[in-house]
């Protein structure tokens, strides 16, 4: 493998050597300028950063954790893990300065009651403000709860009407099955009655001229 070509960066030294050996009789026009103000960078092209070569096998599966952020790790985390691994019972000690009696779990219900009290106070204030506004003439549209109840009632009434029709149809089918007479026999009876009624009606007499 050939090395880097450094001849372009040593053009001034080459010209000086040629002048000293009298190989050239006259200095180039740029000789003094390059000697007084040398270039700040080398004239050769820098080599790009060589990436690590692959193992020869094509990568067909995309990495699933390509866009996953890297885990933030601190030196204190490792020290803390080592400490509690060596002293596991230190985890049972209270670590809050204000509550150092070791009975923090008993305060769970007390904290929940405080939360409920605060929410109840906010709800009462909101209700009083609404009543005062309605007293002076303010009008509020239906809330989400009222709209939801109306939609639920409408759906229930629609279902009730549909269920009533289904029950009536089921009862008719059940009655027909118990009597043992189908719909065809009933239609035949109706046709027979209509025919008998037609026979009972006398035809008008024809007048012969």
UniProtKB/Swiss-Prot annotation:
CDD domains xref list: At1g26750 (cd23701)
Family designation: Belongs to the mitochondrion-specific ribosomal protein mS23 family.
Name of the protein in its database record: Small ribosomal subunit protein mS23
Domain of life of the native organism: Eukaryota
Any coiled-coil regions, as ranges: none
Quaternary state and interactors: Component of the mitochondrial small ribosomal subunit.
Lineage: Eukaryota, Fungi, Dikarya, Ascomycota, Pezizomycotina
InterPro entries found in the cross-reference section: Ribosomal_mS23_fun
An example molecular function term from Gene Ontology annotations: structural constituent of ribosome
Principal subcellular localization: mitochondrion
Cell compartment(s), UniProt: Mitochondrion
């Amino acid at each position: 493998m050939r090395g880097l070509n450094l001849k372009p960066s040593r053009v001034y030294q080459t010209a000086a050597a040629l002048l000293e050996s009298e190989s050239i009789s006259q200095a180039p026009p740029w000789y003094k300028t390059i000697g007084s103000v040398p270039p700040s960078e080398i004239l050769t092209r820098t080599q790009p950063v060589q990436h690590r070569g692959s193992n020869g096998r094509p990568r067909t599966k995309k990495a699933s954790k390509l866009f996953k952020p890297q885990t933030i790790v601190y030196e204190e985390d490792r020290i803390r893990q080592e400490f509690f691994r060596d002293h596991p019972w230190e985890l049972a000690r209270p670590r809050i300065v204000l509550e150092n009696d070791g009975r923090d779990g008993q305060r769970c219900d007390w904290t929940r009651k405080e939360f409920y009290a605060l929410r109840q106070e906010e709800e009462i204030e909101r209700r009083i403000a609404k009543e005062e506004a309605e007293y002076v003439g303010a009008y509020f549209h239906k809330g989400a709860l009222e709209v939801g109840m109306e939609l639920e009632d409408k759906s229930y009434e629609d279902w009730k009407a549909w269920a009533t029709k289904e029950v009536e149809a089921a009862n008719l089918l059940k009655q027909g099955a118990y009597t043992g007479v189908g719909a065809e026999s009933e239609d035949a009876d109706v046709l027979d009655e209509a025919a008998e009624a037609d026979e009972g009606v006398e035809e008008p007499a024809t007048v012969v001229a």
